Amino acid sequence: MRVPSRRPRRSSRRGSLALLLLLTLTLGACASAPPAPPLPPNVEAERLRLEDAWQSFGDLRSLAEIAIRQRGRSQRFNGALLLKRPASLRFEALSPFGPPLLVVAARPEQVTIWEVPAGRAYLLPSTPDANRRWLGLALPTEDLVALLAGHVRPLRAPRSGTLLPADEVGPSVRLSGDEGTQRTWLDPAGRPLKVEWTEGKNPMRVTFTRPASDPATGGSVPRAIALVTLDGRLEVSVTYRDPAVDTGFDPALVTLDVPQGVEIQDFR
């Protein structure tokens, strides 16, 4: 008596396994997070207004006084600041006499920090993690440039949003998503007065002090900016003098070529 061949059963088993795998993948895809619902129209309008204001910014040049207090250590610099959208900046901290004390230049692909008296320079990638090393905040360079220009980049891919009634600062828009929660207070012209991030990588608050009127900038540039992390470990204040916006300066001005003879530490 012949024993029936088991090959058809194996084929059937393989087919069942394939079907089970396909079903598992299909169910897994169905179980993924659904797309976020659209924001309420009034919230989306405010989000777009913030984004459009940032996109309309070109450049800024100004004398600046920058004070930094981090974990009990204080530093103060006076110098010249250049900003160019989307992610370029240059700051030269000037000494009363002689060469600059410090030069920081950031581009979309690289950050260069040159400690002039020490004859040392550091090259870092222009990433949030690298910016944490010198700035103390894991901010994208584009977000840093936006804040220094008096703008706020609205939270990317928000999953919910709310317009909040005015408090002692003004009305505000709150956006929440995977990056945390961002709340931005606005003046009657829709310009940010204060922004606060919570529940993300950089819980902090930034306050903009805007002039009542400024014919040179149309009030788009704040007179002063104060940044503080919510844990109090970092405080930064920036005060501008004679700012000028959208002058169309040469982009080469924000680049920094470290001269020969300077010790370079490359962390890229």
Regions found by a protein language model. Name each.
Residues 1-30:
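Sec-dependent bacterial lipoprotein signal peptides
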Residues 30-76, 266-268:
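N-terminal leader/targeting segments and the immediate start of mature chains
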Residues 53-60, 72-75, 82-87, 213-219:
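Edge/loop elements at the starts and ends of beta-strands within beta-rich repeat scaffolds
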Residues 66, 85-87, 93-97, 108-110, ...:
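A mature extracytoplasmic/lumenal domain signature
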Residues 87-143:
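An acidic-aromatic
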Residues 149-151:
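Scaffold/interface architecture of coatomer-like assemblies
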Residues 160-268:
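Gly/Pro-enriched, hydrophobic low-complexity segments
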